[in-house]
Amino acid sequence: MEGHPDCDLKENWKYYLEEAQQEPEVQAKLSEIRKEYAALNPEDIKLIDPCMGSGHILVYAFDVLMQIYESAGYSQRDAAKSILEHNIYGLDIDDRAYQLAYFAVMMKARQYNRRILNGENTCHVYAIQESNSINRAHLKYFGAGMDDIEKNAAKMQLEGLLDTLTDAKEYGSILNVESYNWDLLRRFVAAEDTAGQISMDSAVSYTHLTLPTKA
């Protein structure tokens, strides 16, 4: 609403609070922020629930985002697909909660796009996975074809990520994951030594490590 104050969307938002009167210097700063927000596209909005449970907040956010997309001229069908791909993200330590949230979000998407389940769609809700079961000795088999500098950098970063995700289900949303070179890590994991018959799936006993997809 900061970027589009004349929009009538807030009439449908029960808990929306009007902005209070501000000091002149604060008001000037807010005006600058509104100019930046006015250039935002609906796809630029990001919302994450780091302890999503069954996905209730994400489902509510889906409806709000749908109103924003429609006000920008999108059809419900296109908006539903875009919301899944660009706008909402969720995490939880419980695998069962993840399953419920995934189902809830996809059913909400289907409410607006009946064909959403027929194609390949990215739903950015995940269960946090621990790195405890990953055999780090197998990391030496990855990075085939990469030069030594890139390979060593990727291995160092991946080991740092594995350290962070040790006992991750105990820490959940308080985890602080550093900013890594995800493109480098994806290439490192994908470039496996086929002669060694090792893949990231075989390096872990329960589940494979999923690196973030490109937004």
Go through each PLM region and give its residues.
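SAM-dependent methyltransferase catalytic region
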Residues: 1-211, 215
